[in-house]
Amino acid sequence: MIIVGGGIGGLAAALACGQAGARPQVLERAATFSEVGAGIQMGPNVTRTLHAWGLAQDLKEIGFVPRKLDAKDTQTGQIIGTLRLGQRSLDTYGAPYFTVHRADLHRVLLKKIRSSGQAELRLDSEVQGLQQNADGIQISGTNLPASLAELSQSAAMVGADGLWSKTRQFVVPPTAPRVTGLLAYRALVPMQSIPEKLRLQDVNVWVGPKVHAVLYPVKCGEYLNLVVVVQGPPPASLDDWDHAGNKQDLEAAMGPIHADLRNMLAAVPAWRLWPLCDRPPIKGPHEMAKGRIALLGDAAHPMRPFLAQGAGMAIEDAAELARSWARADLQVEDRLQMYAQARWARNAQVQQRSIRNGQIFHLQGPLRWGRNVAMKLMGEPLMDVPWLYAGP
């Protein structure tokens, strides 16, 4: 098995499939294995899988277990809903709710793969062409192992190369990702730099007219991860997804906000700006696998971050890919079709719900007040997502 892409999804696939006996080779086009970005939330559906891979202790050493998630109004500062996490996640779903920094999770996966010796990791390697026929697949590119020029009939390729995937074109007709009109300003600051009375032990989601902000501790509570999503035109270059963010532009886009939120954001010395892009929810298994080629994570189903499940769905994909690959009684094509059939509907549902959540977060006028009243009245049952956390 060849895995294209050495991010969180690619390494998760390598670890899971390596444990299933696949002996995967990971091809990463960068010169070093690294992960940039900010924090991620991992619901119990994700941590349950990571624990099954033997990473429970590793997660404790890098992550943070928030007690609860508070939803607040950006203008009044009032708590409009609370979802208990912490012990409730363990009692209800059998696994914890974690917040981590992407780079820390990436490092843990990389360390586990290297210590197991069950996968080969190759840097500075880029797949540029592929031919598939009844006998196998042939790959061309830069700095590839000679053995990849003629792959055996048992060979498969998994595209885990993200939103701007180069391998996606071998499964579905090439189309550009969709520009959402949303901008994410992200930052990571030492918790000590936040005013003491505002330091967090929980996840805070602030919702307001055309804006929302998500704040939570990472790195065992030593840092605060901040994400503010506003509406606005994208930067000129979308291929370069990470840009310097202008603080004045952010403040103008947010409009009036409560003093507590304003004081927390004031502790940020510099912002990074990410234009949010996605694709329409996938419509069937044919968008995740074709012949001996499969797609995983953002290469298959990029999603908006409003359900906090982008990395989670890639990790779930990896676990299902390993289960399907272990079916040695099936041909390679049938194993990949089994994987795609098992995953496409859940991924589509998460994509759809993520879009809907973003719309709810940004409601204005009477609809905003209606949302707030509904959340106050219904509280936890409205905020919990058992169909997601109890799965897959």
Labelled PLM ranges:
Residues 1, 18, 43-190, 234-253, ...:
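Conserved N-terminal helical subregion
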Residues 2-31, 158-159, 215, 249-250, ...:
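Conserved mid-domain beta->alpha element of the FAD-binding
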Residues 37, 53-54, 63, 83-84, ...:
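Short, flexible helix/strand-to-coil boundary loops that buttress conserved ligand/catalytic motifs
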Residues 165, 184-186, 211-214, 300-301:
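Histidine-centered metal-chelating micro-motifs
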Residues 201-236, 243-247, 251-255, 276:
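Active-site substrate-recognition segment that forms the wall
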Residues 239-272, 332, 340-341:
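Flavin-binding catalytic cores
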Residues 352, 356-392:
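Alpha-helical membrane-targeting segments
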